[in-house]
Structures are given as structure tokens and as C-alpha cells.
């Protein structure tokens, strides 16, 4: 399906849409919660999905990984067969990384 992202407070869910809440599915947290690391004095953020690597098969994979920080949202799309990891530039000191599993929904980690 389609996803709509709303940044900021007091944003209403559009009619006909369902609001996703991160980390609420009954699935293995160690394979879904993003792990965030910074590199090069904090100027690069590395995000990977799971402390145990998530599968990347056509029937079960991470569709995208996103960084929400400093009022912006950057989304990196993945396909089956790709490692569930990516890099973000910018050096944000705080933020939230989201990952979307095609079977188990939305997951997040704040740093």
C-alpha cells in the first residue's frame, strides 16, 4: 500500500488511512528494531535493521529505512536481496530511524 508521512505535532490522520505505530507487531524485535551508529565524528549515520540481520527475500524484506531528524525526513528504499542497511549524511545528534518490514510493519529506534 501507500504510506503518508506527517512531520510535526497535532497532525490528523487523513480519512481512509490507518495510522501506523512503531514496534507494536508481534515479531522478533532483534530482527526488526533499527540499530544506529555514527561514523566520522558523527557526520555519517549508519542504520541497519536488527541486531540479528533481517531476511531480504521477495516474500519477507525491509521495504525502506528512514531518518527523521532536525525537521526533515530522508527515506532510502530497498528491494529484496539488498542488505537491510543504509547510510545517512548530515551528522544529526538526535533523531529517529524507522524501518518498514513488508510482513511485520513499522519499527523504530531513537538516538
Features from the language model and the residues they span:
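Short, aromatic- and glycine-rich surface loops/edge beta-strands on solvent-exposed regions
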Residues: 93-103
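Short amphipathic, basic-aromatic surface patches that mediate peripheral association
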Residues: 49-57
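Exposed aromatic-hydrophobic patches
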Residues: 46-49, 84-91
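Short acidic/polar inter-strand loop motif in beta-rich domains
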Residues: 102-110
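Cysteine-rich micro-motifs
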Residues: 8-21
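Proline/serine/threonine-rich low-complexity linkers at boundaries of modular beta-sandwich domains
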Residues: 21-32
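Surface-exposed loop/edge segments in extracytoplasmic proteins
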Residues: 69-77, 107
